[in-house]
């Protein structure tokens, strides 16, 4: 279980990997800058570097982060929030994505801020409004749903 008592508004990578089942190269949250579990809010960060393997093919002469991976990063940040709102013996996994829109490209060197605000939480899962921002401008947005499953299923 994650101890939020030391700094209740931030999580480091060690705390993140204790919550999320993802690992390199698919762990897309580097830090949680702010989290308020009671209010249902999270602000996380992904540092986008040219070393990301997906830039080799997307696209070699004009690298941009694939939109589906931006959504995955948002889902991982949201999954942290939903998990911390839920029962400790379960994990929040992606259920659905609705109203996804991509507003601007995300490029190597960008700092991607992943913002999630709770729309609904229950004992079965949750739903968030999510925004990915670069330089305080929306790069992508969506509503993301989660369901709880036993950790043994992952």
From Swiss-Prot:
Keywords assigned: Cytoplasm, Lipid A biosynthesis, Lipid biosynthesis, Lipid metabolism, Lyase
Main location (coarse class): cytoplasm
EC number of the protein: 4.2.1.59
Gene that this polypeptide is encoded by: fabZ
Similarity section: Belongs to the thioester dehydratase family. FabZ subfamily.
Claim: Lipid metabolism is one of the keywords in the record: yes
Active site: 58
NCBIfam families reported for this sequence: fabZ (TIGR01750), PRK00006.1 (NF000582)
MF (Gene Ontology): (3R)-hydroxyacyl-[acyl-carrier-protein] dehydratase activity
A biological-process GO annotation: fatty acid biosynthetic process
GO cellular component: cytoplasm; membrane
Entry annotated with the keyword Ligase: no
HAMAP family attached to this UniProt entry: FabZ
One Pfam family here: FabA
Catalyzed reactions: a (3R)-hydroxyacyl-[ACP] = a (2E)-enoyl-[ACP] + H2O
Record protein name field: 3-hydroxyacyl-[acyl-carrier-protein] dehydratase FabZ
Organism for this UniProt entry: Protochlamydia amoebophila (strain UWE25)
Annotated localization: Cytoplasm
Function: Involved in unsaturated fatty acids biosynthesis. Catalyzes the dehydration of short chain beta-hydroxyacyl-ACPs and long chain saturated and unsaturated beta-hydroxyacyl-ACPs.
Broadest EC class assigned to this enzyme: lyase
